[in-house]
Each structure stands twice: as C-alpha cells, then as structure tokens.
C-alpha cells in the first residue's frame, strides 16, 4: 500500500485492522492515519470495504451479530476497539451521518435535542441555544427557525440530510463520519452539503465515503483508495488525483476500472 498522508496531526490511527462478516474477511490489514481537522475521503468500487471501514470507527458493526474487528483504532491514543472503552462515549466522540436521510419521527427541535439529552443536562435556555447552534452549523437555521416544532420528515431531502448533520454535531463530537451523504440528493442539495463539509472541518475531523470521484476531489484533503478490502493507496488528494503512485488507483480514478 502506498501511503503519502504524513502531514498534520493524526486524530485517528488505524493499526493492523481486519474485519470479518462471519468467516468472510472483508477488511485486510489496514494501516492509516486520519488527520485532525481535515477531510479524508474513502473511494473505491462497490463492495471494496470503504463503508465497512468507516463503521469500525464508532463500532457501529456491533449492532449486527457475527461481525467482528481485530486490530487497533486509536482516537487520540485510546483504542476504540477494546471492550473497556464505553460504546456510548465512543459514539459521543465519533458521530455518523448515513447515506439516506434518517430524521427521527419527532419535531425538528427534538431531532437535535434527542442526542444531547443522552449525554448532557441542559436547561431549557441552554438547549434552545444548542439547537440553534447545531442548525446554524448545518446551514439550516434560517430555513427552519420558524417551524422548529414541525416534523423533521416535513423537510425536503436535502434539508433532512442537513438536519441529520446538525443532529450529529449537536453532541459536539470530535470526528464526523459521512457515509455517502449526497447519494440520494439533487445537485443543488449536494452543493450545499459540500460547502458545509468545508466549514465543518475547521472544528471536526471529517471522514466521508463517496462513489463520486469529483466530489472526493472537491471536498477532501486526503483520499484513500480501497479495493477488495485492502487499502491500495492513501495520500494527499491532489497527489492521488493528479499523480497516483499505483496504476490500479489511476485506472479507477480515470474510469478504466470500477
């Protein structure tokens, strides 16, 4: 594996990571450093393991029987994969937004407040401030401030995805995982999400899975190319897209493969 992502402080360190769906070996000996306050994109053909890798970062796989990870994922030096590490604290530090917008069946306000209430005790005034802060971070406040008590499902698809991002940042995580957040959105909504990602990296470490090569090139500082569960190449996005070290990477990016 070619690895040229050496600048900036590491927020997440992945060491000798292997992942299994039952007996199927889905992720093979991945080693990489995710840089702090940068956007890292995972690219690769369908089934290559990029979403699986993303979901190891907050142990989302534990919701499903028969799945297991081996190795280390260090968040500021703390191994997230050990049983000693509280899973609820991991998910407070490592937020996630899924491919399809998933607003909770409750008001816009309560969508934001729900996760906060799990981890903090805030007064009504403090919660109001947090809700406004999170919706502002997701560039949604001005669009919904007069209808906070309407259902989150009443919003458009693009607004729903920004609501999910606001919900993710409301608990003030350190890392934000985005699993193909724009795949179900129109170009205008996609552009808003991409602008939002550029803003979020100033306060969060962002990792995004995308099938869209142009999106990876536009949004990310670092890019990881995966194939058949292996990390084939990882480095600065400009280098990966302009002068990749491996022919396999070049073939995928230029459309000759995948």
UniProtKB/Swiss-Prot annotation:
Recorded GO MF terms: ATP binding; ATP hydrolysis activity; ATPase-coupled phosphate ion transmembrane transporter activity
Keywords: ATP-binding, Cell inner membrane, Cell membrane, Membrane, Nucleotide-binding, Phosphate transport, Translocase, Transport
SMART domains named among the record's database cross-references: AAA (SM00382)
Compartments (UniProt record): Cell inner membrane
InterPro entries xrefs: AAA+_ATPase, ABC_transporter-like_ATP-bd, ABC_transporter-like_CS, P-loop_NTPase, PstB-like
Domain ABC transporter: 12-253
E.C. numbers: 7.3.2.1
GO annotation, biological process: phosphate ion transmembrane transport
Binding site for ATP: 44-51
Topology in the lipid bilayer: Peripheral membrane protein
CDD domains from the UniProt entry: ABC_PstB_phosphate_transporter
Root EC class: translocase
Pfam families in the cross-refs: ABC_tran (PF00005)
Reaction(s) the record says it catalyses: phosphate(out) + ATP + H2O = ADP + 2 phosphate(in) + H(+)
Gene3D superfamilies referenced in this protein's UniProt entry, alphabetically: P-loop containing nucleotide triphosphate hydrolases (3.40.50.300)
Transmembrane parts of this sequence: none
SUPFAM superfamilies: P-loop containing nucleoside triphosphate hydrolases
GO CC entries: plasma membrane
Role description: Part of the ABC transporter complex PstSACB involved in phosphate import. Responsible for energy coupling to the transport system.
Record NCBIfam families: 3a0107s01c2
Complex and partners: The complex is composed of two ATP-binding proteins (PstB), two transmembrane proteins (PstC and PstA) and a solute-binding protein (PstS).
Family designation: Belongs to the ABC transporter superfamily. Phosphate importer (TC 3.A.1.7) family.
Protein name: Phosphate import ATP-binding protein PstB
Native source species: Bordetella pertussis (strain Tohama I / ATCC BAA-589 / NCTC 13251)
